[in-house]
A protein has these predicted regions:
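Membrane-proximal interfacial segments on either side of biological membranes
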Residues: 1-68, 79-181, 193-297, 304, ...
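Tandem-repeat architecture and repeat-register "anchor" residues
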Residues: 186, 299-301
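Nucleotide-sugar donor-binding loop of glycosyltransferases
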Residues: 71
Length: 361
């Protein structure tokens, strides 16, 4: 069945009648015994569906159950991006070792072959990614599954867009071993800011250390491309300025990365200018909080207007809420901010100015 699939794929490969591929096969004695089969395949131009490549070159051999691709290169006919691959497959040990470097449109190629989207539909590449990837895989009996897999590499790309929001470039280093992954030196650039940091996933636990100065629209666009249902601001909150966000800590995805999702410990720092809450405008807002399991500890929430400010500290421990509130805003603004949480009795007339300090549980 697998051979039939391979032959089916090969049958789709076309070339011009005037420039057919050239194949040279050499048979020789192998020093270890048996026969060594060498193959040299060259093609000026090949086409597979929508994929068109030129300068195709493959040089390899087979001996003692080992397939060796010494040189495997090609260029994309439209972008001139290249692919360079070296590969060794040991059929006895069921191992595969590879090293690939590419500036070709690999994502478009893969979609053309498997007919499936490999990146969120909200993301569009405006330039081709550059990829370097090496790795080793050990397969189970009959090559039915992978027993061990490790890979490492780096990737970068120029301009791309998410939900129409244009980014300048992105890059990172990455590695993977049997379900555990590491993404380091993550750097995403936007005309209005950047997103940088590292993410590590080990045994169902994801450790995060990221810093963002991306504009709000760009940040929400990235989040929506990953989790569209969750990435939205509360209706009462409007952010017109560009925020700065720092997140450090860990979350648990469960054994086998199958959930349930749970926050272990996260530290969050955020600041923003020109923000509205319940229609009340603030010049700036800053917050610092820590999430531990289901509890939340807010060590700073500072909302600043030209005519006053609000400070809040508090903790939510699952069932208990402890807080301290200080404000010199006009009482009518506090009533607006409270929304449905609090209403002033009709017979009570609010003063024009007041200083408020509240501590409660």
């Amino acid at each position: 069945e697998q051979l039939n699939q391979v032959l089916n794929y090969m049958d789709r490969v076309k070339w011009p009648d005037a420039s057919p591929p050239r194949l040279i096969v050499n048979l020789s004695d192998d020093p270890k015994g048996g026969v060594r089969i060498g193959m040299d395949l060259q093609a000026p131009f090949l086409r597979y569906g929508k994929i068109m490549v030129r300068d195709f070159l493959f040089n390899g051999d087979y001996a003692d159950s080992v397939i060796m691709a010494k040189r495997f290169t090609m260029r994309d006919a439209e972008t001139a991006g290249f692919v360079s691959l070296s590969l060794q497959a040991d059929l006895k040990k069921r191992t595969l070792i590879w090293d690939v470097r590419s500036t070709a449109p690999l994502v478009s190629w893969a979609v053309a072959i498997v007919d499936e989207a490999l990146v969120p539909k909200e993301m569009k590449f405006l330039s081709e990614p550059h990829v370097q990837l090496s790795g080793r895989a050990v397969f189970s009996e009959n090559w039915e599954g992978v027993e061990h897999l490790n890979a490492l590499g780096s990737g970068s790309m120029g301009a791309f867009s998410v939900l129409g929001e244009k980014f300048q470039r992105a890059s990172c280093d990455f590695s993977y071993e049997n379900g555990n992954f590491y993404v380091t030196d993550l750097d995403i650039r936007h005309p209005g800011g950047s997103f940088s940091g590292k993410v590590m996933g080990v045994d169902g636990e994801i450790k995060i250390d990221v810093h963002s100065t991306l504009p709000m629209k760009a940040m929400l666009g990235m989040a929506r491309s990953i989790a569209p249902e969750d990435a939205k601001l509360p209706p009462a909150l409007e952010i017109r300025g560009d925020p700065e966000l720092k997140v450090y800590g860990s979350v648990d995805m469960g054994k086998g990365w199958k959930g349930p999702f749970q926050v272990d410990r996260l530290q969050i720092e955020a600041s923003v200018t020109d923000v509205f809450y319940q229609g009340v405008e603030f010049v700036s807002a800053a917050a610092r909080a820590e999430l531990i399991g289901r509890s939340v500890n807010v060590t700073q929430l500072d909302l600043v207007r030209d005519d006053g400010r609000v400070k809040l500290e508090g903790s939510y421990l699952g069932t208990d809420l402890v807080f301290t509130l200080e404000s010199n805003l006009k009482p009518e603004l506090l009533e607006t901010l409270a929304g449905n949480w609090f209403s002033v009795p009709e017979h009570l007339q609010l003063p024009e100015k007041a200083v408020l300090w509240v501590h409660g549980r």
